[in-house]
A protein has these predicted regions:
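Intrinsically disordered, low-complexity segments enriched in proline/serine/threonine
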Residues: 17, 23, 38-41
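N-terminal secretory signal peptides that target proteins for export/translocation
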Residues: 1-18
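Long, compositionally biased, intrinsically disordered segments
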Residues: 40-418, 430-439
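Bacterial N-terminal signal peptides
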Residues: 21-35
Length: 439
């Protein structure tokens, strides 16, 4: 987060406890609150900043710099669409005065974007460019969201695709660029700010939500943007729950500009998180979700915030290029939706529609010496999990305090797979002392 050179971590879970002779422990498997899938509103900046929302606006970024030396400061959007449907696209960075030729909206077909999330590679040319379509239609208003009224109204219908003449419905909306999807799949959508694709100039966003005109100095960011899926150019029915990303890089322009947006994170086992920013004031930041959070110097989960090293330049600190204590960032894992995800989108991502709660069975501890547990000798835990995921196993020194941050306890963490899992333990607490015989 650019505001305080820190990044914060959140986690939730449900403990599962067991008492064995000589051992007192607690096993934690991650669990989430389930939210039903279904539509809410349109897809884009009007979703993040709906009518009457409080606080400030954060612009969508596309820059060449990174967070943590590997998460590019560019929001690569993804949208599930079925053959014959239309993507309707608009941006406040299209045809901006002074720099009319740099802002653009691009669409890439399935399979063109490859590589690890956070540092992806675009291996081919775009299938669509809003700027090129504007040149073909000759409609200078096409693809540009001019103000808050047009942002909230969304895309107008198109009566004549040849010159992008709008229909009479949704008169307060913007005239969209449009792309008809040739095949069913997940498409990538890129928004370039007025500075173009190869710059790192952040501009000076004003953070205003109620924009009455295209804001100056968007730089490498976009204030108002929209990706709407409809069945046809004349339809007024938005097909929702289709748009997502694996991480958001956003920029308010400065601090004291709180954010109140809501997004939805879906884990690979089908649970849905509703994430409410609740007035967070980060300035420039990246938002993503993963299995591990932040990592300690030994690669284990940290369960704490991370801070930039103070000796670096101001910009390097803001972008967390090196972290105190040789801690690290684990990369993004899970998709972030702007509405509750549509069933078809989850199916395309191979995410189950009905999540299965994690359960542990057949829990055993096997000592190192003919199944005899001696002080300081340790042994192996064996248990069966019904799902893939992560675990935290806390061995309490006194049977009362199961705090994983207490160095007098022993904490084991890692990944589990569906089926039988084994976890080795050296018999020591986190402070290096042997744990005594349990009471």
């Amino acid at each position: 987060m650019s505001g305080d050179n820190a990044m914060k971590s959140f986690s939730t879970g449900m403990p599962w406890g067991v008492r064995l002779p000589g051992l007192l422990l607690c096993l934690l498997l991650g669990t989430l609150v389930i939210l039903p899938a279904g539509p809410l509103a349109a897809e884009g900046s009007r979703t993040l900043y709906p009518e009457d929302i409080a606080g400030a606006r954060a612009n969508l970024e596309w820059r060449v710099s990174t967070y943590g030396d590997f998460v590019l400061r560019r929001t690569l959007l993804r949208v599930y669409a079925e053959a014959g449907e239309y993507l309707l696209l608009g941006s406040s960075a299209v045809d901006v005065p002074e720099v009319p030729d740099e802002g653009d909206i691009l669409v890439y077909t399935p399979g063109v974007v490859t590589g690890p999330i956070g540092n992806t590679t675009i291996d081919g040319d775009p299938a669509f460019s809003c700027r090129e379509q504007r040149a073909e239609t000759g409609n200078e208003a096409q693809g540009r969201i001019n103000d808050r009224t047009e942002e909230l109204a969304g895309p107008r219908t198109i009566a004549d695709p040849g010159d992008a003449t709008p229909g009479d419905t949704i008169p307060d909306g913007y005239i969209p660029c449009f792309y008809q999807v040739p095949e069913t799949g997940i498409y990538a959508v890129v928004f370039y700010g007025p500075a173009g694709p190869g710059e790192d100039y952040e501009g000076t966003p004003n953070g205003e939500i109620e924009l009455k005109e295209i804001p100056d100095e968007q730089g490498t960011s976009v204030a108002m943007w929209d990706v709407t899926v409809r069945a046809s150019l004349t339809s007024t029915n938005d097909i929702q729950g289709r748009l997502f990303t694996y991480y958001l890089t956003l920029f308010t322009g400065e601090n004291d500009r709180p954010l109140w947006s809501v997004v939805y994170v879906v884990s690979s086992d089908g649970y849905i998180y509703e994430i409410d920013l609740r007035g967070m004031d980060p300035n420039g930041f990246v938002l993503f979700a993963n299995r591990q959070g932040f990592l300690d110097s030994d690669g284990k989960r940290l369960y704490r915030d991370v801070l930039a090293k103070p000796g670096m330049s101001f910009q390097a600190q803001n972008q967390l290029m090196e972290l105190q204590g040789n801690t690290n960032l684990a990369g993004p894992d899970f998709p972030i939706f702007f509405n509750r995800p549509a069933t078809a989108t989850l199916q395309a991502l191979d995410i189950p529609l009905e999540p299965e709660p994690p359960q542990v069975s057949n829990f055993q501890f096997i000592g190192t010496d003919d199944n005899v547990t001696r002080v300081g000798a340790g042994g192996t835990f064996r248990f069966t999990s019904n799902v893939d995921g992560t675990y935290q196993l806390v061995i309490s020194r006194d049977g009362t305090n199961f705090d994983p941050t207490n160095p007098r306890n022993a904490v084991l963490r890692g990944f589990v797979t569906e089926g039988v899992n084994t976890v080795a333990w050296d018999g020591l607490a986190d402070n290096g002392d042997p744990l005594p015989i349990g009471q």
